[in-house]
């Protein structure tokens, strides 16, 4: 079971007619978008979107990376699901692969990664409907850890 983690906000303006929040600010830093367990394995992941073939690492915050590293130290599995909107493709970014890009940037290298640098076997198969079929790809990630 995977649940969406609510992002804590403080409303500033509320449209009285529709009761919709029109302006708000974040109360605190959020960790990940989703958390739960799959077949007894703790899972957390964050969803990101990219409309080009270059993903800026500034879209991922250090506190998220630290949270995910600590999550994996507790025998969980952490990853990012990235939607490459211009290509209509989803990618499962393993935390280990992200850390390669992250450490490269920390050492003065590129502060982004390119589509071509990604592992082809972690692109998600197309599916009908609105669901993102990441479970089979997560199994590949787990198999690489054994």
Language-model regions, residue ranges each:
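Short, conserved beta-strand edge motifs with alternating hydrophobic and charged residues
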Residues: 3-5, 44-47, 81-82
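Helix-rich interaction surfaces within compact, conserved domain-sized segments
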Residues: 2-7, 96-146
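Short basic alpha-helical hairpin corresponding to helix-turn-helix/winged-helix-like nucleic-acid-binding
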Residues: 23-30, 42
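Mg2+/Mn2+-dependent nuclease catalytic core
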Residues: 48-74
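Nucleic-acid nuclease catalytic cores
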Residues: 69-99
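Acidic-basic catalytic patches of nuclease active cores, encompassing PD-(D/E)XK
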Residues: 1-25
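Conserved catalytic cores of phosphodiester-cleaving nucleases, focusing on short active-site segments
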Residues: 33-52
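Short, basic, glycine/proline-bearing loop/turn elements
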Residues: 14-20, 46-54
């Amino acid at each position: 079971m995977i649940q969406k983690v609510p992002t804590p906000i403080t409303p500033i303006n509320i449209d009285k007619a529709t009761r919709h929040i029109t302006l708000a600010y974040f109360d605190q830093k959020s960790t990940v978008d989703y958390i739960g367990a799959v077949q007894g394995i703790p899972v957390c992941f964050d969803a990101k979107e990219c409309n080009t073939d270059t993903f800026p690492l500034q879209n991922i915050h250090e506190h998220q990376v630290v949270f995910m590293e600590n999550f994996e130290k507790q025998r969980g599995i952490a990853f990012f699901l990235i939607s490459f909107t211009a290509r209509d493709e989803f990618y499962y970014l393993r935390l280990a692969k992200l850390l390669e890009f992250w450490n490269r940037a920390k050492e003065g290298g590129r502060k982004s990664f390119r589509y071509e640098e990604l592992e082809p076997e972690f692109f998600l198969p197309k599916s009908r409907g609105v669901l993102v079929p990441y479970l089979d790809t997560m199994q590949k990630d787990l198999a690489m850890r054994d």
